[in-house]
Structures are given as C-alpha cells and as structure tokens.
Amino acid sequence: MRSAKLKFEKRRSRIRHKIAKTANRARLSIFKSGRHIYAQIIDDTKSVTIASASTLDEKIKKLKKSHCNVENATKIGELIAEKAVSCGVEEVVFDRSGYKYHGVVKALADAARKKIRF
C-alpha cells in the first residue's frame, strides 16, 4: 500500500513540475473522490479558478446514483470545455493530478479535447 501511494506522489510531482513550465496557459485540473469527479480550470498566474464542473452539478446529478464512471466523466469534460470557451479560454494544459491516464481520466480529457486545445 505504501509503495502505491509513493508511486502516486512521484507521478504527481513529476506532472506538476512539467506543468509549472507552461505558466502562460490555464490548467485543467481533475480530482476523483470515491463517489464524485471534479474538474476545474485554474489560472496559476493570478491564482484564480476560472471555471469548474463536477458530478454535483444539477445537470449531471439527477442522471445516476453512481457518479464516478466513464459516462459521467465525458459529460463533465464537455461541460468544463463549454464553460472554458464561454470564459475565453481556448488552450489549457492538462493536470491529471497523479492519476493514470486511463478510464475516467481519459474519458474526461477526450471529451474536453473536442472543444479546447491541450
């Protein structure tokens, strides 16, 4: 268990180090809990959250009991991309926060990639 958490932390720090080099672009950050998925677009130069979406939003909340799945991740990706475009954000850098690029993370990224550039 400790080695899995250690691998996660190493992956997370490696990703954050690469993202820190691209300070001129906004960051699309994701977080997964046991029941929900959260995505937010952050401007690191101003330390401000530009837009956010999650399975707690009213549009997605009433669909299913289980919220942390691929189907809802695609809807969150589309929703966060729409909010980003409406706020004037065209290009972001994807911060997967140490999670492997598979399943829910991949579905969210692919859905968001249809409207905004990574």
Swiss-Prot record:
Q: Short name of one Pfam family for this protein?
A: Ribosomal_L18p
Which InterPro entries does this one have? Ribosomal_uL18_bac-type, Ribosomal_uL18_bac/euk
Q: Which keywords describe this protein according to UniProt?
A: Ribonucleoprotein, Ribosomal protein, RNA-binding, rRNA-binding
Gene3D superfamilies this protein is in?
3.30.420.100
Entry GO MF terms: 5S rRNA binding; structural constituent of ribosome
One cellular component term from this protein's GO annotations in UniProt? cytosolic large ribosomal subunit
Picking any one GO biological process from the record gives: translation
Q: How does it assemble?
A: Part of the 50S ribosomal subunit; part of the 5S rRNA/L5/L18/L25 subcomplex. Contacts the 5S and 23S rRNAs.
Q: What does this protein do?
A: This is one of the proteins that bind and probably mediate the attachment of the 5S RNA into the large ribosomal subunit, where it forms part of the central protuberance.
Q: Which family does it belong to?
A: Belongs to the universal ribosomal protein uL18 family.
Task: Return the protein name.
Answer: Large ribosomal subunit protein uL18
